[in-house]
Amino acid sequence: MRANEASKKEKIMNTIKNAKFTRNDTLCTISTGDLFSKEDLTGLNRYYKSWKALNEENLRFKMRRANLPELLSEGLASALFGWVRTNATSISGCSSSSCDLVNTETGELIQLKACSTTANTPAGPTSFGPRSEFDTLIFMHLDCEANTASFYKLDANVYKDWMLNRIETIADQQAQGRRPRVTILPKIKASNIQPFYVYSFE
């Protein structure tokens, strides 16, 4: 088989249907999900390089950097940790399907937030829905200077007490039906939270 033919047939993630897991003694089912594997890391590394090169060209032409793609956050997390990417699909047995990933071994619903930084671009804000339901909050910091993705595990309840201004917390704005926005990376640094995993792009 020629090299270009092999490239065209390169394996790219698995789409799984009706994946079952148990959460709080309740059987739940993900109607359709994406499961990446270590074999997908080659493609993800290539995608990262293309995205980084695009941003460098954007800046050269004085354009804004492209947003961090979900493939480089949720897709990478799925490949590294074996979590199923829900891709906003329905999950029977759960009152909410607002999570991004599911650990089908433990039954954890995972919300993943991410940001990317460069030497001249600080971390930007992310938002939480007013009715977000999840068990574990994961934050990924993609450092485009070091070419690393650092994963942090945050308390899924403590984040609601983060102050957004002098009088309101995330929980306060969620109770008002609003979508609070917060820059997470400085709060991680201030709390001296260490990453549980650091991935280096090749």
Regions found by a protein language model. Give the residues of each.
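Nucleic-acid endonuclease domains
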Residues: 2-109, 113-202
